[in-house]
């Protein structure tokens, strides 16, 4: 059985995440009382023929605060039963959450006559702290639209074929901010920039013209060798520490040329020694 626990602040995309998982064969339970997690695990062990092999549950601020505080011990009970379990935590910045609630006109579950929406959003972070601290994968949805969020969940959760560490090599542009879920960040803005070549400006690091230009630059090759050498040494240590997800972010200015080229090459090199390596280009189409 595979169990995915979905949590996060209201408005961050939990419903979308559950919908994606349901569309891909998961049996989904919304707003499960946290205290029922161990019971769910026991049923999985005792009644394998009755329980769906892929289950996703959401646990959020609608739970009793006392149950949320017990989440670490409840999760440990589940894992003690050798259930393949991942915790996904979704979040966005306060301003974005406020905007989303204003646009949808939905009521936040923690608002009252004496607690404003802004206060409720802040209080929710504290309530969900015990879950956020134990998340295997954190996704910041601040800059993601509905379709990007769906694609990201598919890439990170559904492309993980077996237990073990899933590695993501992600290109990005610093002008749109660093990925908040990155574990390792490499800044490649010091390398020659194809953007300043008029004939290359409108091409990307996936295209032959840019690839040939960058491959001919000694500094680019040296940077590539250094990063791959570092990752080949240290990523297995991440895997040995029972990390479920590790994100390696490669950043240039706009996220179109240098970082894309290097992310592709680095991802391909890592696949020679590591299982489950994915490549994503965050800002390529921005």
Curated annotation (Swiss-Prot):
Binding of ATP, residues: 8-15
Positions of GTP binding: 60-63
A GO MF label: GTP binding
Keywords: ATP-binding, GTP-binding, Nucleotide-binding
Pfam families attached to this UniProt entry: PapZ_C, RapZ-like_N
SUPFAM superfamilies referenced in this protein's UniProt entry, alphabetically: P-loop containing nucleoside triphosphate hydrolases
InterPro entries: P-loop_NTPase, RapZ-like, RapZ-like_N, RapZ_C
Function: Displays ATPase and GTPase activities.
Family: Belongs to the RapZ-like family.
PANTHER family, sorted: RNASE ADAPTER PROTEIN RAPZ
Protein name stated in the entry: Nucleotide-binding protein PSPA7_5038
Species annotation: Pseudomonas paraeruginosa (strain DSM 24068 / PA7) (Pseudomonas aeruginosa (strain PA7))
Organism phylogeny: Bacteria, Pseudomonadati, Pseudomonadota, Gammaproteobacteria, Pseudomonadales
